[in-house]
Amino acid sequence: MLISYHWLFALTHTNFSAAEAKERLTMVGLAIDALEAQGQDFVLDVEVPSNRPDCLSHVGIARELTVIENGRLYLPAPEPIKTEGRSAVLTSVEIKDQDLCPRYAARIIRGVKIGPSPDWLANQLETIGQRPINNVADITNYVLHELGQPLHAFDFAKLGGQRIVVRRAAPGEKLTTLDGVERTLTADMLVIADAEKPVALAGIMGGEESEISDQTTDVLIESAYFDPHSVRQTARQLGMDTEASRRFERGADCEGVLRAQQRCVELICQMAGGVATEDAIDVYPRPFSERVISLRPERIPALTSLVVAPDEIRRILVGLGFQPVAENSFKVPSWRIDVEQEEDLVEEVARHTGYDKIRSELPPSNSSGEYQPREMKQRSLRRALNACGFDEAISFSFIQQDTRFELIPSLIGHENDQPQLANPIIEDAAWMRSTLLPGLLSSVRHNLNHGIRDVRLFEIGRIFTIFKAGELPHETLALGIVATGGALEENRAQAERELDFFDLKGALEAAVDSMNLSPLTFTQTSARHLRVGQSALIKSGNGTAIGTIGRLAESVATSYKFRQPLYILELDLGALLDGPEKLIQYSPLPRYPSVTRDISLLVNREVALADIYTVVHNQQVSDCRDVKLVGTFEGGNIPASKRSVTLRLEYRSDERTLRDEEVEAYHSRLTSALLDTFAAEQR
């Protein structure tokens, strides 16, 4: 924003030069990007923080400068003007949507003479990059840059029915704005209308049909407060960015509406003649609610290490417009929408005391730096997944609302309670994520688009849901893993095969084992984002359901344009880390050789591998040391309801070398148990 140094001087009588003002304002958080000479004046290009709309005016910057210099603010004194009649006799104002327009004031000036602005006004506007138009339009622009309140002047004779209606636009309604562009409006856009048609886009730009012209004699001055979100949304949809919209979408001063209008009316009467009505029609259905905040002096050194005298605290806050109402309590001015709590007052004092005076201190610590147990487990988890070929991803926490994915078990029932941002930076990312999967799948899609077919990713991050209305979102630490492509690198001797469910399951089990946690169990389940028959519920060592794993459902895969199988899992990592740890037992290295035997079974497709393992372990064959899955096969000559499962069993004794007949006896016993339990066939 461009600020005139001479204009600042008129408001502050500052002793600072333009260069000194630039330096001092930068030190209180109002960075000056550039300082340039403009004739006899200097122009400061101020980078105003997004939460400080009060500084989008010369008075706002001047207020900061007076506190820095311990000076005072010299606001223009009210000027007497000629008035006659009441506004309510000549016009009326109706607000049909009070949520989007909490306040609207209208005042009429009759008998004005439109012409060029005085040289001082035209030069002042040109200094800050504004093109002079005519005296009335220039005065509204001048007051906007002086006080920060956008205003608009209508040709009163061109208003149908001589009235103002603040309403939403009708779908498809047309309005030609002052830039000559015909715009098609939607039902969520707020307009200023007369009795017949829209005449302005609320808070953005006026309409061409009600524009001030050389023939104008009567004007209606609008001063209002519009909902920031509504103005921002409309401006973005229409691709518009105006001086008015920049201020309204950040938050204007709803209590400054009449003050700015009065200033505008005085200047018009002085420069364009005319007689103003005695008062304004001020429709204010939802008055400003004052905020009072207490500031404990001891909080300032506690938060900033700055020691500030009580008198200095009071001087700074009063200079910034805060009114003391008790010893340590202050009323927040209406233009400071960013101040909501005690810490905000501490920040104001710290800014003007000097951030450079804050001492560098290490935070207090009662012990040497070390990782906490949960952090150690997460480090082990990351290392294990890296060793399995997975890369860690970090995706955006703000996403589009997405109900394609079933939440992890602890959050089921809250699918419709995904937190929505009140002020999203990006319209397509207006929701806080309740699952990690959309971000991971988008990363997979990005890799596939760039020719990378083999993708293995995991993410550790927080997901958000609302359990009770009115409460803050509940945060859950989650783990998401996705895998697709080949299971082996192309330069290996063994032929490449496709990743499958068991590769992903094995990687998870290896990661859990690295954290010294009790083994997980898997039971067949169904989830809307997973393929039927290829999904499982993940349970921690204490039997708590913590997540799901499986192949991505065709409907979801199609929406992402995946043409190859993709396997995913998501679980509640916090619940997993809180699960029971396994008891570590040490044993000597085996002294005797082991013997392996394979067995291939034809089982029903619904038989879970975990159930097969359970049967083997329940036989209590002490010399059966391990059972592993070699592979599964479906299709071909195998019936559609069946699948082939090949297991490898390892036998070994700690006392001697097993004889062939002993191994065969063990193997026959386990084979019979599996055949009988699952009505299986041996292949």
Protein language model annotation of sequence segments:
Residues 27, 43, 60, 64, ...:
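Extended, well-folded interaction surfaces typified by the phenylalanyl-tRNA synthetase beta subunit core
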Residues 30-36, 69-76, 131-136, 321-327, ...:
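Short, well-structured beta-strand/strand-turn elements
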Residues 77-89, 195-232, 262, 266, ...:
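Conserved alpha/beta core surface patches that mediate binding of polyanionic ligands
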Residues 1-374, 379-381:
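RNA/tRNA-interacting regions in translation and RNA-turnover enzymes
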Residues 91-94, 175-179, 186, 202-209, ...:
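Glycine-rich, charged/polar anion/phosphate-binding loops
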Residues 10, 110, 126-132, 246-253, ...:
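Short histidine-centered catalytic/ligand-binding loop motif
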Residues 2-5, 20-23, 319-321, 338, ...:
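A carboxyl-terminal module marker
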Residues 43, 231, 352, 422-424, ...:
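Polyanion/phosphate-binding surface patch
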